[in-house]
C-alpha cells in the first residue's frame, strides 16, 4: 500500500508479544526491521516495507476476534475486541495486523467508525481473499476468540475539530477500497447525529459516495450504506456502480445502481471550494481520478488518496 496525503490535511482532515514489543521501539528501529526483512527476501515489498515511513501510533494492542462473517463471496468481515484502552484511531486509518505463527504482517483499513471503538472497544475490518499469508489466515483459519495484535497507522483520514469550517465530502471507492471510506462515512453520520442531538459540534456538509465493484455481490456493506442514505436523505447520497453484472439487479438496489464505471462528469458535478475528495482503490483508479481533479483545478490540499494492492 502507498499513501499520498496533502500536507495541509495531515493535521485534522485528513508470536504477538515478540512482534508487538519490537514495534514499540523507535521509528528508526521500525525502519531497521523492514530493511532487514527486505535483505532476507527478494520478494516484492510487503505492507511493512511499503509503509515504513508512514506515521504510526506507539500502541500495539492485543485483540480478540469477536465476530467473523462473509461480507461477499470474496471478502470476510472481522470484528475485533481491542484490549488496550489507549488504542485509538481516526476515520480512514489502517492497522498493522499481527498474527501468531505468521511472519508476514498484514495491513488492513478499519471500516468501522471511531465511535464504535469509544463505546464498545471494537473495530471492524473487511479482508479480501488473496494468497497473502495474513489474508489466507483470515479466510481459512481465523475463528471466534482467535487472538491477534493491532497497531494504527496512516495519514489518510477525516478528523475535523468542532470549530473547523464545514466541508462537503466526495468519497470515491473501488472494490475493497470502500473500507476506509466507509469508516469516514460512518464518522460523518456520527457527527450529524451529534449535531442534531446536542445542537453543537462539527457542522457536517453533504457526503456523496461513488462506489464501483464488479457486480452487486461485491458491493460491500450495501445495507449499511443505504441505511445511512435513508437516515440522512438531505445529507448523504450514494451512486453504486457495477462493471460486470450478469444477474438481474434487485428492486431495492435498482434506484442506486449504475451499470458502468464512475465517470469524470460525475466527479466534476460535485466540485466546489467547500468539497474535499477522498479516493481509495486500485492504483490506476486513484491515479486517474486524482489527476482528473487536479486538471479540473481542484486544489491539491482538497484531494486525498490511498492505493491498495
UniProtKB/Swiss-Prot annotation:
Keywords: NAD, Oxidoreductase, Signal. NAD(+) binds at residues 175-180. Residues 1-14 form the signal peptide. It is an enzyme of class 1 (oxidoreductase). It comes from the Eukaryota. Residues 47-161 form the FAD-binding FR-type domain. GO terms for molecular function: oxidoreductase activity. InterPro entries: FAD-bd_FR_type (IPR017927), FNR_nucleotide-bd (IPR039261), Oxidoreductase_NAD-binding (IPR052128), OxRdtase_FAD/NAD-bd (IPR001433), Riboflavin_synthase-like_b-brl (IPR017938). Its EC number is 1.-.-.-. This is Oxidoreductase NAD-binding domain-containing protein 1. It comes from Bos taurus. The lineage of its organism: Eukaryota, Metazoa, Chordata, Craniata, Vertebrata.
Amino acid at each position: 500500500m502507498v499513501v499520498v496525503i496533502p500536507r495541509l490535511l495531515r493535521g485534522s482532515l485528513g508470536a504477538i508479544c515478540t512482534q508487538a514489543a519490537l514495534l514499540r521501539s523507535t521509528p528508526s528501529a521500525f525502519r531497521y526491521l523492514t530493511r532487514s526483512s527486505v535483505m532476507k527476501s527478494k520478494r516484492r515489498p510487503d505492507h511493512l516495507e511499503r509503509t515504513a515511513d508512514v506515521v504510526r501510533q506507539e500502541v500495539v494492542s492485543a485483540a480478540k476476534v469477536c465476530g467473523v462473517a462473509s461480507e461477499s463471496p470474496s471478502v470476510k468481515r472481522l470484528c475485533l475486541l481491542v484490549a488496550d484502552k489507549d488504542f485509538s484511531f481516526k476515520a480512514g486509518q489502517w492497522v498493522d495486523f499481527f498474527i501468531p505463527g505468521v511472519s508476514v504482517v498484514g495491513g488492513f483499513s478499519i471500516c468501522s467508525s471511531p465511535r464504535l471503538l469509544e463505546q464498545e472497544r471494537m473495530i471492524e475490518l473487511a479482508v479480501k481473499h488473496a494468497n497473502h499469508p495474513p489474508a489466507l489466515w483470515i479466510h481459512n483459519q481465523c475463528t471466534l476468540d482467535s487472538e491477534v495484535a493491532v497497531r494504527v497507522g496512516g495519514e489518510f483520514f477525516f478528523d475535523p475539530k468542532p470549530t473547523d469550517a464545514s466541508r462537503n465530502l466526495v468519497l470515491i471507492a473501488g472494490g475493497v477500497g470502500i473500507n476506509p471510506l466507509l469508516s469516514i462515512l460512518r464518522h460523518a453520520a456520527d457527527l450529524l447525529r451529534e449535531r442534531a442531538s446536542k445542537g453543537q459540534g462539527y457542522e457536517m456538509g453533504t457526503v456523496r459516495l461513488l462506489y464501483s465493484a464488479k457486480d452487486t455481490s461485491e458491493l460491500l456493506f450495501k445495507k449499511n450504506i443505504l441505511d445511512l442514505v435513508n437516515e440522512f436523505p438531505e445529507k448523504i447520497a450514494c451512486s453504486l456502480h457495477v462493471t460486470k453484472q450478469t444477474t438481474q439487479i434487485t428492486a431495492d438496489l435498482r434506484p442506486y445502481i449504475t451499470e458502468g464505471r464512475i465517470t469524470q462528469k460525475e466527479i466534476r458535478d460535485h466540485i466546489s471550494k467547500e468539497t474535499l475528495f477522498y479516493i481509495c482503490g486500485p492504483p490506476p483508479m486513484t491515479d486517474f481520478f486524482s489527476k482528473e481533479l487536479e486538471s479540473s483545478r481542484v486544489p491539491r490540499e482538497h484531494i486525498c488518496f490511498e492505493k491498495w494492492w
